[in-house]
Amino acid sequence: MDKVSDDVKQQVDQLKEWANRQPNLPKDIEDAILLQFLHSCYYDLDKSKVTLELFCSIRSSSPELFTNRDPSSPPMKKALQILNLAHYEIPGRRFVWIWQLNDPSLENYDYVQDAKVFMLTTDSWLLSDKKLEEDDMVIMDVKDISLKFITKFNVSVAKKLSKYQEDAMPIRLKQIHIVNAPPFVDKLYALLKPFMKQEITNMIHFHTPNSQTLYDYVKKEDLPSDYGGTRKSMVEFNKDAMELLESRREILSDDNLWRVEKKSKNKNEFSSDVGSFRTLAID
């Protein structure tokens, strides 16, 4: 973790003292994690408090996404096996996050499990000793996506995932790129767009197969070899990601990581089964 000034250390202490007084927040959150919240909010203490509270609140109210997620458990291994994931730094203190699906039939794809994997892997990266980034770029490779995805989609989880990504994660998200976008991508995008703020939709860029438009936003050499770059392949990056998960397995398997168990007045308030599209048939 980067060295910080005395003023920033004081802000970290203030954020920790405040968090420890809140009954709905976990106690004694690590300084390195609190620093990431401050940095992502450009050291605005009040905004950091709001972001941290939402981060913990979503986690506490979403047991289907943040519990029972041992990376070595059969359900998680099954979900991880059809994905290649990457997270690495490029010049300018920028970080690239890449999600690549490898399941052409979508037979093994589960939207809820995919969201759970996202939470798990981003937690592992938050726990790693990384530099404080200037901005984050997300690349999603949808080469294996088909209209069958609609039958896998889950409205409730999509709402939580969008809220978490937009307002709760301690990152400086600046760009989202959808590569190998099929002709019907607009139909899939229409499912997700209602849950996104305009600020996020303005960040999204679509790139058709074999196009070179992604290079307008990131230098070709800074991409994995899968995309014509000089970096490692996605398979190699994914191996690094799996090794990181294994090294953090004990803490990631803790169901109380940055969560405070809370009871909902409405028993079904946070059920991820509500709004599922699984009953639809796609020809």
For each predicted feature, which ranges?
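Basic, amphipathic alpha-helical/coil surface patches used to engage anionic, phosphate-bearing ligands
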Residues: 1-283
